[in-house]
Amino acid sequence: MAPNIRKSHPLLKTINNSLIDLPTPPNISTWWNFGSLLGICLMAQIITGLLLATHYTADSTLAFTSVSHTCRNVQYGWLIRNLHANGASMFFICIYLHIGRGLYYGSYLYKETWNTGVLLLLALMATAFVGYVLPWGQMSFWGATVITNLFSAVPYIGQTLVEWAWGGFSVDNPTLTRFFALHFLLPFIIAALTLVHLAFLHESGSNNPLGIPSSCDKIPFHPYYTMKDILGLMFMLTPLMTLALFSPNMLGDPENFTPANPLVTPPHIKPEWYFLFAYAILRSIPNKLGGVLALAASVLILLLMPFLHKSKQRTMTFRPLSQILFWMLIANLLILTWIGSQPVEDPFIIIGQLASITYFTLILVLLPMASTLENKLLKY
């Protein structure tokens, strides 16, 4: 019989072992769809981003106009821009659900895969932040000013660091130029990290909802999970297209329709919705350095997850106490997201502070305690 080129060719063999003949647990649920959706999001963002970059001018006097020109005069420019802007939202929805799945099912116990995943999240957040600055509207400009200014909280070298990042004494043309360069570069770094992430994942194989080894009865990835992932893709594409075609500006800020003006500060400076939970934690601490540390900790706490796992079972499938705390954590994050979008006024300040304390308490104290208690309950 002639050798199958899919299994013998040096390059196709790698693709085959990663996407076609990959041994996969037979019982992984729809929660395992998000990895492939994130890959599709990344490809879509790189393609739409490249097309937008061909019409974009990274200059503070022309950036706003060039984006406007893309939407008005370029064939389907409006669609490409709307898909790119709302594609970022879909990217974050998928990555947050992907992380939530990892937390619920104990996937973080694959430490290397988990750590590269956290690096991917940080790279994605950096990409989204520098990308938001490029249209050079009011919120772009002031968002860049506020967030880059946080680096000035670093003791001793803070101010120098900020001025080095700005390329001057304020956010200006050099800042925009370098942000464009970074926004172009970072997605390719994300793509490279994704390959590392997958390499580590394929070392151990996928986890599954029961959290038990499934080596004895794995099934090939294709056709079973390729079909399942295409269904997931349809479910993601529907809201994305609905958003991009019917209400493309729903998730954006109206302030960004005004060109950047360093002399006028918007009444409420706030980032895009996917950063609001972290922004709420940042604002809930009345000290600059403390706020910056809490902001960093809110994301970097994910790196501690493997060390906070105290249960004898891997997943939360059969752990009702941990389940309750997990969903409390999700609700808490939604509250933080809401608070981040509100002005710094009376009821919101205290709610934000309580939600921030609850966030860290749930992860660092209550979940490990519940796991230990559940271990004891197993004996009775």
From Swiss-Prot:
Q: Per its Swiss-Prot or TrEMBL entry, what cofactor is needed?
A: heme b
Q: Where are the transmembrane segments?
A: 34-54, 78-99, 114-134, 179-199, 227-247, 289-309, 321-341, 348-368
Q: Which CDD domains match?
A: cytochrome_b_C, Cytochrome_b_N
GO molecular function terms noted in the UniProt entry: metal ion binding; ubiquinol-cytochrome-c reductase activity
Q: Which domain of life does the UniProt lineage start with? A: Eukaryota
Q: Where does a ubiquinone bind?
A: H202
Q: Where in the cell is it found?
A: Mitochondrion inner membrane
Keyword ATP-binding in the entry? The reply is no
**Which keywords does the record carry?**
Electron transport, Heme, Iron, Membrane, Metal-binding, Mitochondrion, Mitochondrion inner membrane, Respiratory chain, Transmembrane, Transmembrane helix, Transport, Ubiquinone
Q: Which InterPro entries match?
A: Cyt_b/b6_C, Cyt_b/b6_C_sf, Cyt_b/b6_N, Cytb/b6-like_sf, Cytochrome_b, Cytochrome_b_C_euk/bac, Cytochrome_b_N_euk/bac, Di-haem_cyt_TM
Could you give the subunit structure recorded for this chain? The cytochrome bc1 complex contains 11 subunits: 3 respiratory subunits (MT-CYB, CYC1 and UQCRFS1), 2 core proteins (UQCRC1 and UQCRC2) and 6 low-molecular weight proteins (UQCRH/QCR6, UQCRB/QCR7, UQCRQ/QCR8, UQCR10/QCR9, UQCR11/QCR10 and a cleavage product of UQCRFS1). This cytochrome bc1 complex then forms a dimer.
Task: Name the protein family.
Answer: Belongs to the cytochrome b family.
Extra facts: Heme 1 (or BL or b562) is low-potential and absorbs at about 562 nm, and heme 2 (or BH or b566) is high-potential and absorbs at about 566 nm.
Q: What name does the UniProt record give this protein?
A: Cytochrome b
